[in-house]
Swiss-Prot record:
It holds the Pfam family Cpn60_TCP1. GO terms for molecular function: ATP binding; ATP-dependent protein folding chaperone; isomerase activity; unfolded protein binding. It comes from the Bacteria. Its EC number is 5.6.1.7. Forms a cylinder of 14 subunits composed of two heptameric rings stacked back-to-back. Interacts with the co-chaperonin GroES. This is Chaperonin GroEL 3. Signal peptide: none annotated. Its main location: cytoplasm. It comes from Burkholderia ambifaria (strain ATCC BAA-244 / DSM 16087 / CCUG 44356 / LMG 19182 / AMMD). One of its GO terms (cellular component) is cytoplasm.
Length: 540
């Protein structure tokens, strides 16, 4: 085990705060409509240019081990906020830095860090309650576009394309972001169910130009086990051949003799067939097979249902107007399932969404609802260069998460104004002692930080801007894009409540941990001696 370097008290905290400041200062230049770019070096290829706070935070590693601890702790604020809300990473980092800086002054003055933390937590809880009261739900296409535009750094084209996508596939629909082939952003809507499994063998391709297998008016066989023996498949193959229809086989896996026979018949044109692996794993795979069965009117051939592959008939097969099978995915369009059964299935999955406590499970269940109820929208991001494409794609991802968050919990006035207005309830709060009162005051001052940074990045004097905003009420605030004051909601400067709430919660949580730190432990630097120079060669 290597030797450790240990620091205590003020010495430990000072180095951590230095790391916090380095990371936060690099991230906060991106905040607001007039935020600046950050250029990040890449070991290979061109550097990345970004205005995305979390992308900047993820790249920062400091040489000093103790300072790096501070940077990595604050990096967690950005990452956690991005995971939960998808945006607000820069705001969260700015708030964390402000709480840490204010708090350290009080700790240095001899106040009890634990009481300061209790005061901070008390003030944050009051502010969060007020934020929920300020929040208003969004419903119109225009409001959704406004949220998307703000999150994409005032890019109205991105806001509009996200609003159009949500209108077409529903607010719970699946919206994916891909690299485009042109200079303009494009929106493609895929009707039907798409899942991320492609053909088992490229020999099933019947359109070499598009590298895909297209099956029109196809029958669909669903099996939850591996198919290796061709004898098991023969009854189904003979029945579909007589019916003169193409066949899609979805199974756990298809290999050996069964795959070889299908490939040979497909290549000779005797059978129009394609085989894909079933999507998902374990219980999720069973559920998704059942979804496909309900969508297409099929029965899953499974031991649990008492069905055997050898005895399967045409009645057990589903059908769809068109099936598209590519290398990475399969799309089933216009399945022949019963509409009432599909609606009942969607209702059942929505109940599971309400009951689940896991964010991952919730996301997967929402995807299943979207695939059954709507379609899949694909936003293709257009740009002139690869560097611009990556930067733009990051902004579209941010905007997409922000609009979903806004639909979920509503919106509040943007530009840092919501936090200023929400602190009104905390001004009258009292702690159990003077140290807790100081903790409450730390939060009240820190809530000004996002607006200060937005104003500073726009080239205005922060103190003047804050004084002017505090003179007004409600949605009145500073629009950094135009440099004017007015009703921010009316001007379309709004933030999702979930983003603002998550940013404050995570910032206060991490800042509280830093303030209550009293020792730090890191690997001691190794004393590596320089390599010995080789002996000179003797000349003869």
């Amino acid at each position: 085990m290597s030797a450790k370097d240990v620091k205590f008290h003020d010495s430990a905290r000072a180095r951590i705060v230095k790391g916090v400041n380095v990371l936060a200062d690099a991230v906060k230049v991106t905040l607001g409509p007039k935020g600046r770019n950050v250029v990040i070096e890449r070991s290979f290829g061109a550097p990345t240019i970004t205005k995305d706070g979390v992308s900047v935070a993820k790249e920062i590693e400091l040489k000093d081990r103790f300072e790096n601890m501070g940077a990595q702790i604050v990096k967690q604020v950005a990452s956690k906020t991005a995971d939960v809300a998808g945006d607000g990473t820069t705001t969260a980092t700015v708030l964390a830095q402000a709480i840490v800086q204010e708090g350290m002054k009080h700790v240095a003055a001899g106040m009890n860090p634990m009481d300061l933390k209790r005061g901070i937590d008390k003030a944050v809880a009051a502010v969060l309650d007020e934020l929920r009261k300020l929040s208003k739900p969004i419903s119109t296409n225009r409001e959704i576009a406004q949220v998307g535009s703000i999150s994409a750094n005032a890019d109205e084209a991105i806001g509009k394309i996200i609003a159009d996508a949500m209108e077409k596939v529903g607010k719970e629909g699946v919206i994916t972001v891909e690299d485009g082939k042109s200079l303009e952003n494009e929106l493609d809507v895929v009707e039907g169910m798409q899942f991320d499994r492609g053909y088992v063998s490229p020999y099933f391709i019947n359109d070499p130009e598009k590298q895909a297998a297209y099956l029109d008016d196809a029958l669909i066989l669903l099996h939850d086990k591996k198919i290796s023996n061709i004898r098991d498949l023969l009854p189904v193959l003979e029945a579909t051949s007589k019916a003169g229809k193409p066949l899609l086989i979805v199974a756990e896996d298809i290999d050996g003799e069964a795959l070889a026979t299908l490939v040979v018949n497909a290549m000779r044109g005797i059978l129009k067939v394609a085989a894909v692996k079933a999507p998902g794993f374990g219980d999720r795979r069973k559920a998704m097979l059942e979804d496909i069965a309900i969508l297409t009117g099929a029965t899953v051939i499974s031991e649990e249902t008492g069905k055997q592959l050898q005895k399967a008939s045409l009645e057990d097969l589903g059908s769809a107007k068109r099936v598209e099978v590519r290398k990475e995915d399969t799309i089933i369009i216009d399945g022949a399932g019963d509409q009432e059964r599909i609606e009942a299935r969607v209702k059942s999955i929505r109940t599971q969404i309400d009951e689940t406590t896991s964010d991952y499970d919730r996301e997967k269940l929402q995807e299943r609802v979207a695939k059954l109820a709507g379609g899949v929208a694909v936003i293709k991001v257009g740009a002139a260069t690869e560097v611009e494409m990556k930067e733009k794609k990051d902004r579209v991802d941010d905007a997409l998460h922000a609009t979903r968050a806004a639909v979920e919990e509503g919106i509040v006035p943007g530009g840092g104004v919501a936090l200023l207005r929400a602190r009104s309830t905390a001004t009258s709060l009292k702690g159990a002692n003077s140290d807790q009162d100081a903790g409450i005051q730390i939060v009240l001052r820190a809530l000004e930080a996002p607006l200060r940074v937005i104003a500073s990045n726009a080239g205005d004097e922060p103190s003047v801007v804050i004084a002017k905003v505090l003179e007004g009420k409600g949605n009145f605030g500073y629009n950094a894009a135009t440099g004017e004051y007015g009703d921010l909601v009316e001007a379309g400067v709004v933030d999702p409540t979930k983003v603002t709430r998550t940013a404050l919660q995570n910032a206060a949580s991490i800042a509280g941990l830093i303030l209550t730190t009293d020792a730090t432990v890191a690997d001691a630097p190794k004393d590596e001696k320089p390599a010995q120079a080789p002996a000179p060669e003797l000349e003869y």
